[in-house]
Every structure is written in structure tokens, then in C-alpha cells.
Regions:
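Generic detector of bulky aromatic hydrophobic side chains
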Residues: 23-24, 37, 76, 92, ...
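A polyampholytic, Gly/Pro-enriched intrinsically disordered region
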Residues: 15-19, 83-86, 180-189
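Conserved RecA-like helicase motor core of SF1/SF2 enzymes
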Residues: 53-54, 58-153
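Short, flexible segments with low predicted structural confidence
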Residues: 52-53, 121-122, 164, 184-185
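Glycosyltransferase donor-binding loop in the core domain
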Residues: 13-16, 127, 204
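Arginine-glycine-biased low-complexity disordered regions
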Residues: 33, 131-218
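Interdomain coupling/hinge region of P-loop NTPase helicase/AAA+ cores
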Residues: 1-73, 79-82, 138-144, 156-171, ...
Length: 218
């Protein structure tokens, strides 16, 4: 029998180390349209800081947690994560011990787990409380043997995935944007913005105003 929960979809992507950040961003944009709650595992403190910082620079609500954090800092980060003010938490295995947040929709093994037990423990953070979850693992070609060991010991059903193209990601983002605009219109709370729209149209080309609106909503 498998050691992993049946409601967790497990997918592996072969990715070079240099391409991992781009791969993660594509999957976040394409797979959850900005609604997922992600726990991303890295091996080292330095990698945790770098990944979280790069995600923030790209506009994601990301935070980090590792062994150098004080208890007060750790509690502050976890509160943000639980409250939904941060939807991507990048952490080391040690820092994530005892983490129990049932709303996590995706676990990402940015760095492949060092052993099968770690794999099972990591991905067990999603698919809780009867919910479905997704476990994503990045492997380099040199780590294929390690992946096979994880599969053999855990009996995990891990499928190989293909990263979405940039065009597919853009399509998903535009679909999400359209939904946001429709929700905004349905709320009928935009009367107060009509004066601002008139002032912008008096100074700018309508196409420029459109681009400003799109950039603001996204």
C-alpha cells in the first residue's frame, strides 16, 4: 500500500536548477489562477531566502521561514500565512516541523527530498481535512535515481508532467483577469471611480487607460 494520502495528486517535472523559479511561477499562474495556498520546500536557508525574495519581486505574496528565524518571527510569518495575507510560504524541513494548516492546496518540492520519509512527510501537509491536494516535485536529470527510490519505498503514484507553455500561462492569467473584472462590475461599487476615469481620459489615450486598468487589476 502507498504511504501517501489518496487525495493528493503527485506530479514530477524535470527541470534544470536554473529554470526552477520560472517553472514554479508558471505552475502557480496556470494551475490555480492565483487562488492556491502553496508550501514550497527548499534544502538550505539561503535557497529559501532567494526563492521567496524572487517570488516577491515578481509580484507574489510570498514569505520565508527557516532555522534562523526567532520564535516571534516564525509566529508572525505563520499568522500571515493562516490569515491569507501570504499565499506562498517557502521553508526548510526543520522550520516546517509541526506546521498544521489544513488550507494548503499545493506542496512544492523545489529541492527533491533527501529520502522517502521526508517526501511522505512533506506532501502530507496538503490533502488534509478531506480536501484534495497537489504535490509537485522538481527533479534534475541527475536526480532521477533518487526519485525512483522515493517511488519504490513510498509506493507513491507520481506522474510525470509537462510544464505549461508561456502562451498557456498567459491564457490562464487573462481568464483570471476577466473573472476579476466581472466580479468588480457585479459588485456595482465603481461609481466613485467615474470621475477619475473622466480625468484620465482627458489626459491620456483610451488605449493607455486600458493598459493602466489591466495592470492595476492584475
Amino acid at each position: 500500500d502507498t504511504l501517501t494520502a489518496p487525495k493528493i495528486s503527485q506530479i514530477v517535472y524535470e527541470v534544470r536548477n536554473a529554470d526552477k523559479l520560472d517553472a514554479l511561477c508558471r505552475l502557480i499562474d496556470f494551475g490555480s489562477e492565483g487562488t492556491g495556498i502553496y508550501l514550497v520546500f527548499c534544502h538550505t536557508k539561503r535557497e529559501v531566502d532567494e526563492v521567496s525574495q524572487h517570488l516577491r519581486l515578481r509580484g507574489y505574496e510570498s514569505d520565508a521561514m527557516h532555522g534562523d528565524y526567532t520564535q516571534a518571527q516564525r509566529e508572525a510569518v505563520l499568522k500571515k500565512f493562516r490569515d491569507g495575507r501570504c499565499d506562498i510560504l517557502v521553508a526548510t524541513d526543520v522550520a516546517a516541523r509541526g506546521l498544521d494548516i489544513s488550507s494548503i492546496s499545493h506542496v512544492v518540492n523545489y529541492s527533491i527530498p533527501q529520502n522517502p520519509e521526508s517526501y511522505v512527510h512533506r506532501i502530507g501537509r496538503t490533502g488534509r481535512a478531506g480536501r484534495e491536494g497537489v504535490a509537485i516535485t522538481f527533479v534534475t536529470p541527475r536526480e532521477d535515481r533518487q526519485l525512483r527510490l522515493i517511488q519504490s519505498v513510498s509506493k507513491a503514484q507520481i506522474k510525470r508532467g509537462k510544464l505549461p507553455s508561456r502562451e498557456e500561462v498567459l491564457g490562464a492569467r487573462l481568464t483570471g483577469l476577466e473573472e476579476k473584472i466581472n466580479e468588480f462590475i457585479d459588485d456595482k461599487h465603481f461609481d466613485k471611480f467615474l470621475g477619475l476615469a473622466d480625468r484620465l481620459l482627458a489626459k491620456l489615450d483610451p488605449k493607455d487607460v486600458e493598459m493602466i486598468v489591466v495592470g492595476t487589476v492584475t
